[in-house]
Amino acid sequence: EAAKDKSALGGAFSPRYALPVARMAYVPRDDGIPTGFWRSVSNSINPFLLESFMDELAVEAGVDPVAFRLRHLEGLPAEQAVLRAAARLGRWGEPLPDTPGWR
């Protein structure tokens, strides 16, 4: 039960995307991997899941993933600035080089 495991959804709510409808669910599962001394258990995987889903939503909406995120970070200039800087430094929107290892 999520009420018993407060860290289950850790990292899933960290990004403050303005989503008009959002619901998170937790289904407990014993996968046999002890996590007692694993630092940042849920924060190490949940943000990846959230961002992957944001990519899927952007594709479904037919919108560039960076533009989609910026739209849902409205009113959060610091977060928008970080995303814009990451996109610029990562050369987002530029074609990939036609060299081995890039395709």
Where is each model-derived feature located?
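Short, intrinsically disordered, charge-balanced linker/junction segments flanking boundaries
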Residues: 70, 96-103
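Structural signature of cysteine-dependent C-C bond-forming condensing enzymes
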Residues: 86-97
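N-terminal leader/propeptide and maturation segments of large enzyme subunits in energy/redox metabolism
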Residues: 30, 34-88
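Generic recognition of flexible, low-complexity loop/linker segments
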Residues: 55, 92-94, 103
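Glycine-rich loop/linker segments at domain edges
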Residues: 1-52
